[in-house]
Structure formats: structure tokens, C-alpha cells
Amino acid sequence: MAADRAQNLQDTFLNHVRKTKTPLTIFLVNGVKLQGIVTWFDNFCLLLRRDGHSQLVYKHAISTIMPGAPIQLFEGGEDSPA
């Protein structure tokens, strides 16, 4: 049944950067900048690792996530996700 359910963009993005260990820059709503790689995530938070230290970051505190390298989530051109 889980295979029939399409993954949302947020989960697809986070799963891709987790699997590829893509370095991220995360800006929080209060302006704080965090950097690291995602090692785990769920519906409410993600675990960010850098220099051997992990930080639990609540998703409601995140404003922007910028990958350190270009990523390709979907097959085809830039306007194919829909």
C-alpha cells in the first residue's frame, strides 16, 4: 500500500539529500544559519550532522534549505515534476 502512495516533495528532497549525503545550509526563521548533512528525518524534525556533532532541528523552525550542490529529483527537464 505504501508503494501506491506518492511521496511529497519535502520527503523526496530530504530523502535524496540524506542518501547522497549532500551538504546543506539551513536558515531558521530567526535567521540562524546551520550547515551539515541530514542523517535522519520524520514528519516533525530532522537530524543534522557536522564535524561529528548532531543537531535535532524542528521543521517548524526552518525557513530555507539550500543544497551545497545541484540536485536532480525527477527524471526529465526542469518543468517535469507535475
Swiss-Prot record:
Keywords: RNA-binding, Stress response. One of its GO terms (molecular function) is RNA binding. Residues 11-71 form the Sm domain. GO terms for biological process: regulation of DNA-templated transcription; regulation of RNA stability; regulation of translation, ncRNA-mediated. Transmembrane segments: none annotated. Belongs to the Hfq family. PANTHER family: RNA-BINDING PROTEIN HFQ. RNA chaperone that binds small regulatory RNA (sRNAs) and mRNAs to facilitate mRNA translational regulation in response to envelope stress, environmental stress and changes in metabolite concentrations. Also binds with high specificity to tRNAs. This is RNA-binding protein Hfq.
